[in-house]
Design a protein with these regions (language model features):
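Short hydrophobic/aromatic patch on the recognition helix
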Residues: 39-40, 44, 89-90, 94
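Terminal helix-turn-helix DNA-binding modules in bacterial transcription factors
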Residues: 10-18, 23-28, 46-85, 107-109
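Short coil turns linking two alpha-helices in DNA-binding domains
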Residues: 33-37, 85-86
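…primarily DNA-binding HTH/wHTH and HhH modules…
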Residues: 69, 91-109
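Membrane-proximal linker segments that couple transmembrane helices to downstream signaling/catalytic modules
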Residues: 1-8, 18-22, 31-34
Length: 109
């Protein structure tokens, strides 16, 4: 990657983290940063070690773990905060990442 491409990849990361609860599609993102879709996908994975939406999912799950361990939010509130349309999608994603349900995670915290 050249400096300009790297700058655009970093911008892409900033954009998806800023709008994590309503992220743009890959096509929208590539248009917004003015970088080809293929270059975006390859460059992002090369720079951050994982595909765009895996990076975003990991970010959301880490954020979920922080919010849940704070004890101020219940599972449904965290689900809404992270932009999930329903809590069952959130619970499934959380369990896939951490191996336990959010409720079990809260009890262990």
């Amino acid at each position: 990657l050249n400096d300009d491409q790297l700058r655009k990849i970093r911008l892409a990361k900033d954009i998806i983290l800023e709008r994590f609860n309503e992220p743009p599609t890959l096509v929208e993102l590539s248009e917004e940063i003015n970088l080809g879709l293929r270059q975006l996908k390859q460059g992002f994975k090369e720079t951050y070690g994982k595909p765009v939406f895996q990076y975003l999912l990991d970010y959301k799950m880490d954020k979920a773990a922080k919010l849940l361990s704070d004890g101020k939010y219940n599972v449904n509130e965290v689900s809404i905060e992270l932009g999930y349309s329903n809590s069952s999608h959130f619970i499934h994603a959380f369990k896939k990442k951490f191996g336990i349900t959010p409720l079990s995670f809260i009890k262990q915290s």
